[in-house]
């Protein structure tokens, strides 16, 4: 039986939604229909050890910076806790990370073996939630670990992305 183009696209969209790396075959936990920057999306059920977040995109042609934040909600006043902020700074070629709990920023970490991002090139960032840290993998290479500063992993339920990049996939 032949399917119309609309039916085929709808079926493919449904398959993509249910086969995301953060989902079980039965229920989608993370589904982002529009990937515009700045981006804010909900992570159903929050984080837990074993859960992975995938961010794929393309760095803009003349980038200054971009950041990825995992937060405990999206409140602005009072500001939600930031479990991890990853910030790529192109002028200094740094990939910085920090957390902000109860309105107080911790000590910023900056040591990396190399700067993985290139202007006008695609990238793949994986944030693995493990016990007791986040493991950050860029383009298949482990770059660093960042120890949890937020006590309740399940409270980390929002992802925010901003800056000089185009998003192509989240999962």
Curated annotation (Swiss-Prot):
Signal peptide: none annotated. The gene is lgalsl-a. GO terms for molecular function: carbohydrate binding. It holds the Pfam family Gal-bind_lectin. Keywords: Lectin. Does not bind lactose, and may not bind carbohydrates. This is Galectin-related protein A. Residues 38-170 form the Galectin domain.
